[in-house]
């Protein structure tokens, strides 16, 4: 394929080297004549192991060349990759000047180009950037229509400096955000020889995936550091602790607990988070990330309440009261917290939980629920159909399988709030079911 790459920094230079090495005809484009001279002489503009050899091979075989002429590069290629920087502004927002400038240059050339051209955003941009910035500029400057006259896609990169060549050749996955199927097909053809799954999504999803991955990496580093700091303060080697923690691939390093949904609860997690952060504080160990966990958890309960309150309805069915399906443990259940908030604001609440029978609740479990909702026995109803029929809003609170059907076929005249992910799609067919994170 004939490819132009705009921006020859860490991402663009690596892409130029790797794509040309795989036989594609690559034109590297940059406003810096110094970078272009380096590329055309087989020299790398950045320090990256193995890159210079790839660039030399591309130049010697005629598969790679550099230019400062944007228009010539676009006319000579079928696909353009935008790899320019998106640095932070002082307020933390993204600086999109480079993206906007490149899009204008591409758009002006597309105005007179007869063949279909595909524009791929490789730069890291926030969700909505392509839809609200990139495409409008391209359409305005070209006078053409995205998805009809030219293609648009997002292709987030997962390259780490110092291992970028290996990361390109052996990616964990290839993510394609496509504006239209034809654009996705063109981009997929570049990566089919790589031994990695190709995942095609909407553009905004692909944009968000990149940020989620990077923020997750930052979170892991911060988490490990805070655990290490606390461990050291109590006389323990944090490396030894995390080495064992990372050996658990079933829970600790897995998809488990990595699904958006409702707050955590139960007799262990809240108690242990509070205990560890209290100990850290007593030892004057700063743990901002760990200290934020309970606040964030409470915020998610508030989000659920706000969803209920946004409807013009007062009769609410809460399906599930224990902190998870298959147990009667009510201690620190976020559903108890939600029920308490709803009652406090005057909602007419009815609760169904097949595992919670008030006459059989005892000990610490009974003490907890009575301290939170003293009249809980009058709210519990074992008649599932009656609870549903008497409500205006139905909250799916845990993963009891009998609740699933309500997420995908909302009873007539009612609203459903899904806290657990039963909805098959982000929006229900009738528009009357809504997920807390989707």
UniProtKB/Swiss-Prot annotation:
For this protein, the Enzyme Commission number is 1.1.1.132
Q: Which InterPro entries match?
A: 6-PGluconate_DH-like_C_sf, GDPman_DH, NAD(P)-bd_dom_sf, UDP-Glc/GDP-Man, UDP-Glc/GDP-Man_DH_C, UDP-Glc/GDP-Man_DH_C_sf, UDP-Glc/GDP-Man_DH_dimer, UDP-Glc/GDP-Man_DH_N
Keyword set, alphabetical order: Alginate biosynthesis, NAD, Oxidoreductase
Residues that bind GDP-alpha-D-mannuronate, according to the entry?
A: 161, 210, 214, 217, 225, 256-257, 259, 262, 265, 324
Kindly list the biological process annotations in GO that this record carries: alginic acid biosynthetic process
Q: What terms describe the molecular function in GO for this protein?
A: GDP-mannose 6-dehydrogenase activity; NAD binding
Provide the function of this protein. Answer: Catalyzes the oxidation of guanosine diphospho-D-mannose (GDP-D-mannose) to GDP-D-mannuronic acid, a precursor for alginate polymerization. The alginate layer causes a mucoid phenotype and provides a protective barrier against host immune defenses and antibiotics.
Q: Which NCBIfam families match?
A: NDP-sugDHase
Protein name per the record: GDP-mannose 6-dehydrogenase
